[in-house]
Amino acid sequence: FADKRDSQCLEQIVELTEENLKENGIELQELLADGGYSSGEALAYLHEKNINAYIPNFGQYKSEREGFTFNKEENYYQCTKPEGNQAKLLFKGEKTDSKGYTKRTYRSSETDCKNCPLREQCCGKSTKFKKLDDSIHKEHYDRMHQKLTQNATYAKKMVRVRSKTVEPVIGTLVNFTNMKRVNTRGIKNANKHVLMASLTYNLKKYLRFITKK
């Protein structure tokens, strides 16, 4: 997984985890991950699999557009600024940027914004129209945002669980056991190295909680 972003690895990680859990008669019901695993594709996969996930949306996500409301039925943005010209930003198509993200573009006409007193503030000094871009996976980001905000208490609890159980592992292995590098050649040997380190970590953790005789 080292040559990919975390979000690109989520599907394979989930499948491997499910296989391991099934061998022990355990069903995957909830999934916790940090924002690095957030992507439209990852959230779409989890939704399709009906997995109840708690993953903070990535940094560029915006749940609301200040001064604009979205008309889902007719697929356009409406300017709602009291001092503005109430322009409509119509859907203009989809475009993939240099980073590989496909977005939907919404744009007003120059005529609608031409004499608006907020044009320069809203559009910029040289631009004559307003443009907004949304991810093609916006519905999945919105669904996750709604879950995290409507169930804020439980979502925060899940963050604490993740912080206590998942995030300290790599820090412990690197800082306390000095596993700053894998001293093996090849992916298979590196995988064995990490598996043994994980096994040792889990065994030490287990021994802390068993009843002492």
Task: Describe these PLM feature segments.
Residues F1-K213:
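Anion-binding and metal-coordination hotspots
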